[in-house]
């Protein structure tokens, strides 16, 4: 899903969509595609919306990333369920993995999750890493590679799990350099952005 407006990233996201902003020198969506390829995936459908043309121009047909990319448009930000519905409209069929395009995963996580899901025989699965904060009601505590099972408890347990699913990734930060003078952060860190 690459359709969101990225309101918390303003003012950067007013000019560039979050998935094309770099982390560790590459667009975050490129890191996601790399993980999908490493996990054995051969195609991906990217749901675009806000500044869609930039995402589509960056990814093209996906050949530069080793994965076939097709697109679905979400004309207005109507949430994740609508984004999945848009993907289904262009021919996506289960089983499928739904992920925000600006999520970083540790190496191998996507493939391990897909393998665990396939072996589970369950109709669906949700992966997340608990953040240590107490959940307001019930919370799941399985790691990404845990045995999958149905959610127990009231429906709002799913809401808590979905909230935490956005916190799946750990970011590894490499070497940084000292800054002793004025610096155009956009030009220095995002050279491929216009």
Which residue stretches match the model-derived regions?
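Conserved donor NDP-sugar-binding/catalytic core segment of glycosyltransferases
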Residues: 117-124
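Conserved N-terminal catalytic core of the sugar/cofactor nucleotidyltransferase
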Residues: 8, 22, 26-110
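Catalytic-core segments of class I nucleotidyltransferases/pyrophosphorylases
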Residues: 97, 104, 111, 118, ...
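Conserved beta-strand segments of alpha/beta enzyme cores
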Residues: 19, 68-70, 167-169
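A phosphate-binding catalytic loop at a beta-strand-loop-alpha-helix junction
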Residues: 1-12
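Conserved beta-strand termini and adjacent loop/short-helix elements that scaffold enzyme active sites
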Residues: 49, 72-74, 127-129, 171-173
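A generic "binding-loop/recognition-motif" signal
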Residues: 5, 16, 51, 175
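Short beta-strand/turn micro-motifs composed of small residues
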Residues: 2, 48, 100, 128-129
């Amino acid at each position: 899903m690459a359709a969101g407006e990225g309101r918390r990233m303003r003012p950067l996201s007013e000019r560039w969509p979050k998935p094309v902003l770099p982390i560790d020198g590459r667009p975050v969506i490129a890191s996601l595609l790399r993980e999908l390829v490493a996990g054995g995936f051969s195609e991906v459908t990217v749901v675009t919306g806000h500044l869609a043309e930039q995402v589509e121009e960056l990814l093209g047909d996906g050949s530069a990333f080793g994965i076939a990319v097709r697109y679905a448009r979400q004309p207005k930000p109507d949430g994740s369920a609508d984004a999945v519905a848009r993907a289904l409209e262009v021919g996506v069929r289960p089983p499928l993995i739904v992920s925000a395009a600006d999520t970083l995963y540790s190496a191998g996580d996507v493939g391990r999750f897909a393998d665990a899901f396939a072996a589970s025989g369950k109709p669906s699965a949700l992966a997340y890493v608990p953040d240590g904060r107490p959940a307001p009601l019930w919370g799941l505590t399985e790691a990404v590679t845990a045995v999958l099972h149905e959610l127990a408890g009231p429906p709002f347990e799913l809401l808590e799990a979905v909230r935490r699913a956005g916190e799946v990734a750990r970011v590894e930060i490499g070497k940084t350099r000292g800054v002793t003078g004025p610096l155009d952060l956009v030009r220095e860190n995002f050279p491929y952005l216009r």
